[in-house]
A protein has these predicted regions:
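Cysteine-nucleophile amide-bond enzymes
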Residues: 1-179
C-alpha cells in the first residue's frame, strides 16, 4: 500500500474569497500530492502567483509560488491509502498532463458555473477539483464524488484520513517532527 494526499487550501486571494462566498465552504482549492512532504503536489490553478489568470496545470510548492506569496494559507491535508497499481495509474495520469501541458487549459467557466449549479466541461479543461477527481478516477478508484465537484467534496472519500489542519507553511515543520 502507498499513500496519496489530498490537500485542501484557502489562500485568501480575491478569487478564493469569491469561490468561498458562493460555495460557503471552508476551503476553495484542492491539490493532489504523491508524497507526505508535498514535494510532488499538483493541481490546476494560477500560473503566476501575482495574477489569477491565466490558469492551467501547476506543480505546486509549499514554500514558493502562490503558497509562498500567501503565507497565511489555511490547509487541511488528508491521506488516502491506495494500492501500488492505483498509485502508478494516478502518477501516470498526472505525468500525461504534465508532459503535454499545452492542450490542457483552466476551466474557468466550469468553476463559476458551479455557482449557478451548472456543469460546464470542455475536453482537456479542468479546474482544481475536476483535475484531482480525474486523477483518482484514472486509477480505477471508486470515488462516488459528485459531477459538479468542489474541493470540500473530497472529505467524503471512503477511508480518507485527516493528517493535518492549520497553516500550510507549518505543515512541513509538523510533518518533520513526526518523522
Amino acid at each position: 500500500m502507498k499513500k496519496i494526499y489530498i490537500v485542501l487550501t484557502h489562500t485568501g486571494t480575491v478569487l478564493s474569497r469569491i469561490i468561498k462566498v458562493y460555495t460557503k465552504d471552508e476551503f476553495s482549492h484542492v491539490s493532489i500530492a504523491l508524497d507526505k512532504d508535498l514535494k510532488q503536489m499538483y493541481s490546476f490553478g494560477r500560473l503566476n502567483p501575482y495574477m489569477p489568470f491565466p490558469g492551467g496545470f501547476v506543480h505546486e510548492y509549499v514554500n514558493s509560488g502562490t503558497f509562498e506569496r500567501f503565507k497565511k494559507t489555511r490547509a487541511a491535508i488528508y491521506s488516502l491509502n491506495v494500492k501500488e497499481e492505483e498509485y502508478e495509474k494516478i502518477y501516470n495520469a498526472i505525468k500525461k498532463i504534465q508532459d503535454a501541458k499545452e492542450p490542457y487549459k483552466f476551466n474557468i467557466i466550469g468553476l463559476f458555473a458551479i455557482a449557478l449549479k451548472l456543469r460546464i466541461h470542455k475536453e482537456h479543461s479542468f479546474y482544481c477539483a475536476e483535475f484531482v477527481k480525474y486523477s483518482l478516477e484514472s486509477s480505477g478508484i471508486e470515488t462516488n464524488l459528485p459531477v459538479m465537484i468542489r474541493p470540500e467534496n473530497f472529505k467524503s472519500l471512503k477511508n480518507i484520513k485527516l493528517e493535518y489542519k492549520g497553516t500550510l507553511k507549518n505543515y512541513r515543520k509538523t510533518c518533520q517532527s513526526v518523522l
